[in-house]
Amino acid sequence: MSDKIRLLEGKVSSVAMDKTVVVRAERYVKHPLYGKFVKKTTKYYVHDENNECKEGDVIKFKETRPYSKTKKWCLVDIIHREK
């Protein structure tokens, strides 16, 4: 693993699990043939120790040690709360 910490931002799409939130992060990728930028969405399972996130919040999260088979990201900060 490299020394650089990967930080990402995304919108919380599910808070159904205990201490875990599902986050959708969007990125733009250039199509190899046509050159148009296409929006890609990736789903991340993020560890939320205090269950402080709500659905619709925009959060910042970082890569960390594996908490489970699918959960390898940890909550850093809540950027914007959904009303």
Swiss-Prot record:
Pfam families: Ribosomal_S17. It comes from the Bacteria. Keywords: Ribonucleoprotein, Ribosomal protein, RNA-binding, rRNA-binding. The keyword Signal does not apply. GO terms for biological process: translation. SUPFAM superfamilies: Nucleic acid-binding proteins. GO terms for molecular function: rRNA binding; structural constituent of ribosome. One of its GO terms (cellular component) is cytosolic small ribosomal subunit. Part of the 30S ribosomal subunit. Belongs to the universal ribosomal protein uS17 family. This is Small ribosomal subunit protein uS17. It comes from Francisella tularensis subsp. tularensis (strain SCHU S4 / Schu 4).
